């Protein structure tokens, strides 16, 4: 004990500095890992569309706006995606106000995301004109649905199967979705909620 208490100030400063550096390196590694996972996830999702928008705000028609995690341009039209990264067993249904997540001893609920998805689809439809607009709530592979998936909900791994990327366009003519998609692009703006819900590794 005496040896520790008698250490010179310079030694204490070096110890403190090493601790700060260690904490900083640990934080940087976690940040880098999370960023790498996020980038891989975004790449997997956006690969489904021929074009995409990520983390944008769309006008709601009443002076405000909705945050959109993803909007994909597909051969079927535009697809609004609400990304959910939760771990554990998810119990949800079309008529339930709240969905429950059970992860070992941990249990929590979140508001049924279907109604907010409908609002976002309607907002994009108001801009897209004749372009069909669909929506899905996408869960990462960390989630499981023991009692089945609710309506408009799918797992990330099945996204490409549900929306196969086929070369669009009318043979010998322009793609009828070019103008509606450009209208969507022109109407949205970057969202301040970008990265607000980090994706865990």
Each model region followed by its residue ranges:
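Amphipathic, interface-forming alpha-helical segments with heptad-repeat character
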Residues: 85-100
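Surface-exposed interaction regions that form or flank ligand-binding interfaces
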Residues: 1-66, 73-78, 87-89, 103-201
């Amino acid at each position: 004990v005496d040896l520790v208490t008698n250490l010179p100030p310079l030694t204490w400063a070096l110890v403190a500095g090493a601790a700060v550096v260690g904490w900083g390196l640990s934080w940087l590694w976690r940040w880098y890992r999370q960023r790498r996972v996020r980038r891989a996830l975004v790449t997997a999702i956006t690969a489904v569309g021929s074009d995409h928008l990520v983390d944008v705000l769309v006008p709601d028609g009443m002076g405000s706006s909705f945050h959109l995690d993803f909007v994909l341009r597909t051969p079927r039209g535009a697809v609004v995606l609400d990304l959910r990264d939760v771990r554990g067993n998810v119990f949800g249904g079309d008529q339930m106000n709240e969905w429950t997540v059970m992860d070992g001893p941990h249990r929590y609920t979140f508001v049924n995301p279907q109604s907010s998805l409908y609002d976002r689809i309607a907002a994009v439809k108001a801009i897209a004109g004749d372009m069909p607009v669909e929506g899905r709530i996408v869960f990462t592979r960390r989630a499981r649905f023991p009692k089945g998936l609710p309506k408009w909900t799918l797992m990330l791994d099945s996204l490409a199967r549900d929306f196969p990327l086929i070369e669009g366009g009318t043979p010998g003519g322009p793609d009828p979705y070019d103008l509606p998609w450009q209208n969507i692009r022109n109407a949205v703006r970057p969202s301040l909620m970008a990265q607000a819900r980090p994706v865990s590794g």
